[in-house]
Swiss-Prot record:
Residues 1-75 form the Carrier domain. 4'-phosphopantetheine is transferred from CoA to a specific serine of apo-ACP by AcpS. This modification is essential for activity because fatty acids are bound in thioester linkage to the sulfhydryl of the prosthetic group. The gene is acpP. It comes from Aster yellows witches'-broom phytoplasma (strain AYWB). This is Acyl carrier protein. One of its GO terms (cellular component) is membrane. SUPFAM superfamilies: ACP-like (SSF47336).
Length: 76
């Protein structure tokens, strides 16, 4: 469920088909996400999942799986 929501957020933000986004998709290398795109994505994720993601944590997200794991771990 979290993965599906994150896929939707990414696809909407970057105008992509959700089928192109996997857990192993890398934000910078595969999606071309720059720092502004990453910040916007995190802000949407924070709203959607009602959590706070620090700037330091944001910098550690390299793949879709990283953010999915973080959200899974920090929501209950």
């Amino acid at each position: 469920m979290i993965f599906e929501k994150i896929k939707d957020l990414i696809a909407t933000q970057l105008s992509l088909d959700t089928s192109t986004i996997t857990l192993d998709t890398r934000f910078k290398e595969d999606l071309g996400l720059d720092s502004l795109d990453a910040l916007e994505l995190v802000m949407e994720a924070e709203k959607t999942f009602q959590i706070n993601i620090s700037d330091a944590t944001l910098q550690n997200f390299k793949t879709v799986q990283d953010i999915v794991f973080y959200i899974t771990k920090n929501t209950s």
